[in-house]
Amino acid sequence: TIKKGEIIKFGHNLKNEKNCINLTKPLPSKNKFSKYFSIDDGKYSFRTIKFTKKILIGKSISSFTMKPKKGLNIPHSIYDNNEQKKTYLNYIKYFDKLKINAIGLSFVQNHELILFLKKKYPKLILVSKIENIKGLKNCENICKYSDVIMIDRGDLSAEIGDEYLYNAIIKISDNAKKFGKPLIMATENLETLSKNINPTKNDIISLGFSSQVNSDIIMLSEETAISKK
């Protein structure tokens, strides 16, 4: 459990010491210093104390229980293209043995990564997740060269700010439609079903909005993975 006001250090390959959380991947190569960052799709926030290429230190805004395999969101971060290429090549080599025909690409920032992977694996279906500021800026070309587009509303809102989420979704969906690419809407579509038997009115309205912006697929995750009902 992380307590309100507790100072936590995040980093890749850190030593096992108190108040340290090891990340599975390195921190972003470039970043615009942000006063706050968050985890778990923006649910829990930290005030930034120190941010370098190797460590991120923050003060927790609230008390909460830290669960494994939750994402870290640092607004306005830019990820290294070469590191992304290496990461996905390693994943695809492993998946290729399992005869998997599609792969989701997180934090796609431009179409270069897509063309690079398509050249090496032309038959592989690439699902590009547009979920940060650079990906949103280049979403037209990302939509043009991808096979499928996914909007991760949780990561996207945590990266660009809640106030920009609505217009960002419209922009991405318009470009997906422009190039005739299937659109997946993900994150918190029926989140209350992780605790309740029936969806709320907000859930229903959210699904209606996803339909209006031409979503072809509604993706459920926590709603079905951790339901207590």
Over which residues does each language-model region extend?
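Non-catalytic helical/linker scaffolds that mediate oligomerization, partner binding
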Residues: 1-229
